[in-house]
A protein has these predicted regions:
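ATP-dependent small-molecule kinase catalytic core of the GHMP/sugar-kinase superfamily
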Residues: 2-15, 21-25, 29-36, 134-244, ...
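Short beta-strands and strand-loop turn motifs
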Residues: 23, 61-63, 105, 214-218, ...
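Short, active-site-adjacent cap segments at secondary-structure transitions
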Residues: 58, 253-255, 290-292
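Glycine/serine-rich anion-binding loops at beta->alpha junctions
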Residues: 103-132, 244-258
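Residue-level signal for inorganic ion chemistry
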Residues: 22, 50-52, 76, 117, ...
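Short, basic/glycine-rich phosphate-binding loops at helix/coil junctions
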Residues: 56-69, 124, 146, 211-218
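ATP-binding N-lobe of GHMP and related small-molecule kinases
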Residues: 2-111, 130, 134-140, 166, ...
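A broadly conserved amphipathic alpha-helix scaffold signal in soluble, globular proteins
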Residues: 81, 123-129, 143-146
């Protein structure tokens, strides 16, 4: 039995960080059509912001300018409804009338392989679990999150991880917290197209976590994406003139790592001066082994 939902009226703004896939291998395809993956997730300090304001009725409302995703398809709304439905299922004798306004400030580009939607969903689950005092553990929230998307659990758990399965089997990993230059070309990559493509490498040898440092960290989706989206290949070439560039997830974002913020910003200024990419989204961010979401959660529970 969980606690009775809270009736607090306080608004709070919670972070939803982006992530990078530092490597991505595919070791096979399952009977259900999904792929078995091995990937390394690390968070970066580039975030969406979600402000949660309790309502006096039971409506769940998303507020965001220039965001054309219908509410019924929005993963934020789906996450909020999922938490409430799960609570009512677990506590059938409880009256739950809590609603919420969710003001989204969208900074993470959509369809860029940075996990923005999954992160927004994870933040919604954790924030409303706190706001509504529904009393679920991180493990329980991660389980709920998996039904929303394979990347949601890593954002719920909040630690850099070596992931397997469809991305839900997570082992904590300690990584150097480098500075990253991230470049997002103006294209939305179809994840479905990538994973259905006949040219996709699906037979990588499985790697054990203890052997991870001995293997080349590559993204097997890169050849498929660059072949079908030349602008992603262009992004890799632009950064590649200064530092080794990789693609995150199924793209379209491309990144490179640096030891210092100054080094990353110097290269960023150089590539921004190139006319053909001056309108592309680009930024420098710090790699993080612990999610800003969990730092914020801890600040609320002290």
């Amino acid at each position: 039995m969980h606690n009775k939902p809270s009736t607090t009226t306080r608004s709070l703004t919670w972070p939803a960080p982006a992530k990078l896939n530092l490597m991505l291998h595919i070791t096979g395809r399952r009977e259900d059509g999904y792929h078995d993956l091995q990937t390394v997730f690390q968070f970066i300090d580039y975030v969406d912001e979600l402000e949660f304001t309790p309502r006096s009725d039971d409506r769940i409302i998303r507020i965001c300018e220039d965001f054309d995703v219908p509410e019924d398809e929005d993963i934020i709304i789906r996450a909020a409804r999922l938490l409430r439905e799960r609570y009512l299922q677990d506590n059938p004798s409880t009256t739950f009338s809590s609603g919420v306004d969710i003001q989204l400030t969208k900074n993470i580009p959509m369809g860029a392989g940075l996990g923005g939607g999954s992160s927004d969903a994870a933040t919604t689950l954790i924030a409303l679990n706190s706001l509504w005092a529904t009393g679920y553990s991180i493990d329980e929230l991660a389980e709920m999150g998996l039904s929303l998307g394979a990347d949601v659990p890593v954002f719920v758990r909040g630690f850099a991880a070596f992931a397997e399965g469809v991305g839900e089997k997570l082992q904590p990993i300690s990584l150097d917290e480098k500075w990253y230059l991230v470049l997002v070309p103006p294209v939305h990559v179809s994840t479905k197209m990538v994973f259905e493509n006949l040219d996709l490498t699906r037979d990588c040898s499985a790697i054990k976590l203890c052997d991870l440092s001995r293997h080349e960290w590559r993204n097997v989706c890169t050849p498929v994406v660059t072949k079908n989206y030349p602008v992603v290949s262009q992004a890799i070439d632009v950064i590649g003139k200064y530092s080794k560039a990789k693609m995150s997830g199924t793209g379209a974002s491309v990144f490179s790592s640096f030891d210092t913020k100054v080094q990353a910003e110097e290269v960023l200024q150089k590539i921004r001066s190139k006319h053909e990419i001056e309108t592309w989204i680009s930024f420098v961010a710090k790699g993080l082994n612990k999610s800003p979401l969990h730092h914020f959660l801890e600040s609320q529970t002290r």
